[in-house]
């Protein structure tokens, strides 16, 4: 990945990334041609290759950009929500889930699916480098939950009975599946219902583990 520092060059690079992310989400990685990205971003072939070594290099940069923007967006949404009590670590997990639900609601008019999900489907079986990076993306999502799950488990006295890392990954699986169900059913309440079940499952799991 090539490094640029000038404001104009940075703006051009970000425009290419934004259009690539949009097209990857809408059409998929394999069906999106570099020429389409260049046209959508209004850049020449020379300008494109000034910033990226090729489509693969661009794909990794799209993932990095997506994860950074996702994290920033969720943090900003959380700051506008009522905070949980200091002694309620599970409330921090629920706050993140509520922020995810709000972020999805804000983006429901966008065409195309989740770029992470789309690239996972398209590339995990055919490109080991992308498979590893996409796995890191999902694990990065899981790490947002794990510290709060650790605290909740310690609070319940269930430290020897709950694998918080696998529990965090389970949450990510529910989140990603709920996003797909919401889109395919075109039911904006689908995610809310699934998250309600998830929250109740987490409450009961920790309560059961402490007995």
Question: Over which residues does each language-model region extend?
Answer:
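N-terminal intrinsically disordered/low-complexity leader segments
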Residues: 1-11, 153, 208-211
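Hydrophobic alpha-helical connector segments
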Residues: 61, 75-112, 164, 168-171
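An amphipathic alpha-helix signature
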Residues: 17, 71, 94, 142-150, ...
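Short, basic, alpha-helical segments at the C-terminal edge of helix-turn-helix-like DNA-binding modules
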Residues: 64-71
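Hydrophobic alpha-helical bundle segments that form small-molecule/ligand-binding pockets
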Residues: 126-132, 139-167, 204-211
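Amphipathic alpha-helical segments used for helix-helix packing
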Residues: 92, 107-132
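Helix-turn-helix
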Residues: 11, 15, 19-61
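Amphipathic C-terminal alpha-helical segment
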Residues: 103, 107, 121, 171-189, ...
């Amino acid at each position: 990945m090539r490094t640029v520092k000038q404001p104009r060059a940075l703006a051009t690079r970000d425009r290419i990334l934004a259009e690539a992310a949009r097209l990857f989400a809408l059409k998929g990685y394999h069906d999106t041609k570099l020429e389409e990205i260049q046209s959508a971003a209004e850049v020449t072939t020379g300008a494109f290759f000034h910033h990226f070594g090729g489509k693969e290099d661009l794909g990794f940069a799209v993932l990095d950009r997506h994860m950074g923007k996702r994290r920033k967006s969720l943090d900003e949404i959380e700051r506008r929500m009522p905070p949980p009590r200091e002694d309620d670590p599970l409330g921090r997990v629920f706050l993140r889930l509520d922020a995810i639900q709000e972020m999805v609601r804000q983006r429901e008019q966008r065409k195309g699916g989740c770029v992470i999900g789309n690239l996972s489907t398209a590339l995990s079986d055919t490109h080991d480098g992308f498979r590893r990076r996409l796995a890191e993306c999902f694990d990065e999502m899981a790490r947002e939950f794990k510290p709060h799950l650790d605290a909740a488990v310690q609070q319940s006295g269930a430290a020897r009975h709950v694998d918080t890392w696998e529990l965090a990954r389970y949450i990510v699986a529910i989140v990603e599946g709920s996003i797909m169900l919401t889109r395919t059913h075109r039911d904006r309440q689908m995610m809310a219902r699934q998250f309600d079940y998830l929250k109740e499952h987490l409450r009961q799991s920790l309560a059961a583990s402490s007995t």
